[in-house]
Amino acid sequence: MEKKTMEFEINNGLWTIEEVSEEEMIREGEKDYTLGLTIYKTQRILLLRNQKNIKKTLVHELMHVWLYEYGHNAQDRQFNHEDVCEIVASCNDFVSDIAKRFLR
């Protein structure tokens, strides 16, 4: 089976989305129940191939990318209601566009 991949740009960075096997996901250091993984160092999103909710997983991982690229990091533990609304409004077009292109 051919590996599905796609590149996209965000904030002057080039990222790659890849569908991978469970073995490949585990090689990246993740547990066997991981559906998706964002690797900031290499600017890659890995998605477990043949999962039922690949769209949801892809959108989840794209949110990690968007937050990272626009200055939010894993240390940002608290967002108020307005913060969440602003983030969703700001990233919606980007996330929807990339997800549609990959899932075609």
Give the ranges of each region predicted by the language model.
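Well-ordered beta-strand scaffold positions
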Residues: G13-W15
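Hydrophobic (often cysteine-bearing) scaffold residues that line and stabilize catalytic clefts
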Residues: K55, V59, H81-V84
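Catalytic zinc-binding patch centered on the HExxH motif and its immediate surroundings
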Residues: M1-E9, E18-R44, K55
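Short His-Asn-centered micro-motif
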Residues: L47-R49
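Small, basic N-terminal interaction modules of short regulatory proteins
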Residues: K52
